[in-house]
C-alpha cells in the first residue's frame, strides 16, 4: 500500500529576473519536433541530514529561491510550449508542489513492488492515459515531499518535447549548485540545437499511445552479476573490453528474443534500437550543456533464425554504434519510421542514463539515497541507470504482463523492489 500523502501547497516559481524581449520566442529544433509529447519523470530521495537545522518550510523556501535564480538562465523552462513549434518564454512560471507524506522514508522505498506507486512523488502525470491529466504545454514542474523522518523526495517532470536526459542533468546540476550557494555554474545553450537542426513547418507531433497490460520491473545488475556476464562474454570472444551497458542490453535482448520466439514464433528479424547522444558525434562536437533533444536512434538486428547465447549479440550492438551518418535528421526520421512499422514483439528499445552523475546531485544536505524514474506505458522500452554504488546497472523494463512471466528465473531473480540499498 502506498503511503498517504497530503498536498500542502502549489505555486508558480518565476525567474528571478524577467526574460529579455529578445529571448521571448525559443524555436525548437527539428529533432525536438520528432519527439513524443510526454515528460521525462525523475525522482530523487534524500535521507534526513543529521547536521541540518532546516525545517520543511525553510527547505522549501530555499529550493524555491534557488529555482527562481536558475530559471533566469533556463528561461524556456518557465514558459509555455506552443504546439510542436516553439516555446513562449513568457515567464509564466514553473509549478512547484509541496506535500507531506505520512510515513518514514525507509517505509516508503524499501518495498516498492508496484512501480506506479512512485508516480505520487511527481508533480503531475508524465504520460497520457494515466489517472492524472498531463500538462503538455508546461516545460517543467517540480514537487517536494517531506517524510515524517525528515527525509525528502524531489520529483521533476521535464518536457521531452524540448529536452533529453542530458538536458535534464544539465538543469539539475545547475539547480543543485545554485542551491548550495555556488556562484559559478555551467550555463546552458539554447541556440545550438535549432541552428544545427532547423525546425520544419507543419511537422506533426507524434503522440504516445499507451500499450495495454504492461507491467514494469526494475532489474538490478550488481557488480558481481556484471562481472559474471563479463567473464561469460570474454570466454566466448577475443574482445575483452565490454561496457556494463553492452553486457546488460545483450543479456536482456537474448531473453526477450527467447520469449518472442516461444510466444509468436520466428518470423522476422529481431531488432534493438538505442537512443544515442549526438553532441559528441557532431563535427565539431557540441558542448554537453547544449539543450534540446540532440540525439538519434541506432539499430542493430539479428535474423529470425538466430539461436545463440547473449555474447553473440554484443557484436551487432557495437557495430551499430560505430555507424556514422551526416544527415542526422534523416537518420532519426528513418528510425522513427522503422519503430512504427515493426511489430512490438520484434523490437527492444533502450536508453542509457548511466554515467550522468545523478547520485552526485546535492542540494546542500547530502547526496541522494535513490535516484529513479517511474513506469513507462510502452512494452519492451528499457531504461538503464547507474546503481548507487556506480559499478552496477538498473534496468527498468516494461513488458506485456504474460511475456514478463515467461522470462527465465535467472533474470527474474534480479528484480529488486528495495530502493534504499
UniProtKB/Swiss-Prot annotation:
Tissue expression: Mainly expressed in roots and, to a lower level, in leaves.
Outcome following mutation: residue 243 to A: 83% reduction of activity
Known outcome of mutating residue 362 to A: 65% reduction of activity
Active site: 160 (proton acceptor), 362 (proton acceptor)
EC number(s) stated in the UniProt entry for this protein: 2.3.1.160
Pathway recorded for this protein: Alkaloid biosynthesis; ajmaline biosynthesis
InterPro entries assigned to the protein according to its UniProt record, in alphabetical order: CAT-like_dom_sf (IPR023213)
GO molecular function, one term: vinorine synthase activity
NAD in keyword set: no
Practical and industrial applications: The strictosidine aglycone-producing AJM7-DeltaHYS yeast strain expressing pathway genes of the VOM module, RsGS, SBE (GsSBE, RsSBE1 or RsSBE2), RsPNAE, RsVS and RsVH, accumulates vomilenine. Additionnal expression of pathway genes of the AJM module, RsVR, RsDHVR, AAE (RsAAE1 or RsAAE2) and RsNNMT, leads to the production of ajmaline. Ajmaline is an anti-arrhythmic alkaloid commercially used as an efficient drug for the treatment of arrhythmic heart disorder.
pH-related activity note: Optimum pH is 7.8.
Catalyzed reactions per annotation: 16-epivellosimine + acetyl-CoA = vinorine + CoA
Comment on activity versus temperature: Optimum temperature is 35 degrees Celsius.
Enzyme class: transferase
Domain of life: Eukaryota
Short name of any one Pfam family annotated for the protein: Transferase
Function comment: Acetyltransferase involved in the biosynthesis of ajmaline-type monoterpenoid indole alkaloids (MIAs) natural products, important plant-derived pharmaceuticals used in the therapy of heart disorders. Catalyzes the conversion of 16-epivellosimine to vinorine, precursor of vomilenine, an intermediate chemical in the biosynthesis of ajmaline. Acts on gardneral, but not on polyneuridine aldehyde or N-methylgardneral.
Assembly and interaction partners: Monomer.
Identification of the protein by name: Vinorine synthase
Organism listed in the record: Rauvolfia serpentina (Serpentine wood)
Organismal lineage: Eukaryota, Viridiplantae, Streptophyta, Embryophyta, Tracheophyta
Amino acid at each position: 500500500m502506498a503511503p498517504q500523502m497530503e498536498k500542502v501547497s502549489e505555486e508558480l516559481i518565476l525567474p528571478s529576473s524577467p526574460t529579455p524581449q529578445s529571448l521571448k520566442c525559443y524555436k525548437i529544433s527539428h529533432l525536438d519536433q520528432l519527439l513524443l509529447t510526454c515528460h521525462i519523470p525523475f525522482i530523487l530521495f534524500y535521507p534526513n541530514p543529521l547536521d541540518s537545522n532546516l525545517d520543511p518550510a525553510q527547505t522549501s523556501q530555499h529550493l524555491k529561491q534557488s529555482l527562481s535564480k536558475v530559471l533566469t538562465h533556463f528561461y524556456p523552462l518557465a514558459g509555455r510550449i506552443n504546439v510542436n513549434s516553439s516555446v513562449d518564454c513568457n515567464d509564466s512560471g514553473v509549478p512547484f508542489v509541496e506535500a507531506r507524506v505520512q510515513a518514514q522514508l525507509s517505509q516508503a522505498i524499501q518495498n516498492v513492488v508496484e512501480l506506479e506507486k512512485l508516480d505520487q512523488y511527481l508533480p503531475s502525470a508524465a504520460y497520457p492515459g494515466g489517472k492524472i491529466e498531463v500538462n503538455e504545454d508546461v516545460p517543467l514542474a517540480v514537487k517536494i515531499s517531506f517524510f515524517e523522518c525528515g527525509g525528502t523526495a524531489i520529483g521533476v517532470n521535464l518536457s521531452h518535447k524540448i529536452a533529453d536526459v542530458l538536458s535534464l542533468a544539465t538543469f539539475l546540476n545547475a539547480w543543485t549548485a545554485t542551491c548550495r550557494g555556488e556562484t559559478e555554474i555551467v550555463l546552458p545553450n539554447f541556440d545550438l540545437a535549432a541552428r544545427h537542426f532547423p525546425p520544419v513547418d507543419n511537422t506533426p507531433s507524434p503522440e504516445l499511445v499507451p500499450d495495454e497490460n504492461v507491467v514494469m520491473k526494475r532489474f538490478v545488475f550488481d557488480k558481481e552479476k556484471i562481472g559474471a556476464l563479463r567473464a561469460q562474454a570474454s570466454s566466448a570472444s577475443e574482445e575483452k573490453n565490454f561496457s556494463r551497458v553492452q553486457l546488460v542490453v545483450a543479456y536482456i535482448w537474448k531473453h526477450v528474443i527467447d520469449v518472442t520466439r516461444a510466444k509468436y514464433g520466428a518470423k522476422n528479424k529481431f531488432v534493438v534500437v538505442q537512443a544515442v547522444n549526438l553532441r559528441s558525434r557532431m563535427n565539431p562536437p557540441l558542448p554537453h550543456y547544449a539543450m534540446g533533444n540532440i540525439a538519434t536512434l541506432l539499430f542493430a538486428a539479428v535474423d529470425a533464425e538466430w539461436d545463440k547465447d547473449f555474447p553473440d549479440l554484443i557484436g551487432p550492438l557495437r557495430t551499430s554504434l560505430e555507424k556514422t551518418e551526416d544527415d542526422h535528421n534523416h537518420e532519426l526520421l528513418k528510425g522513427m519510421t522503422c519503430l512504427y512499422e515493426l511489430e512490438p514483439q520484434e523490437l527492444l528499445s533502450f536508453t542509457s542514463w548511466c554515467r550522468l552523475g545523478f547520485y552526485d546531485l546535492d542540494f546542500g544536505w547530502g547526496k541522494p539515497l535513490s535516484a529513479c524514474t517511474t513506469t513507462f506505458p510502452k512494452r519492451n522500452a528499457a531504461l538503464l541507470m547507474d546503481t548507487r554504488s556506480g559499478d552496477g546497472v538498473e534496468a527498468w523494463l516494461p513488458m506485456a504482463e504474460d511475456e514478463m512471466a515467461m522470462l527465465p528465473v535467472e533474470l527474474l531473480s534480479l528484480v529488486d523492489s528495495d530502493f534504499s540499498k
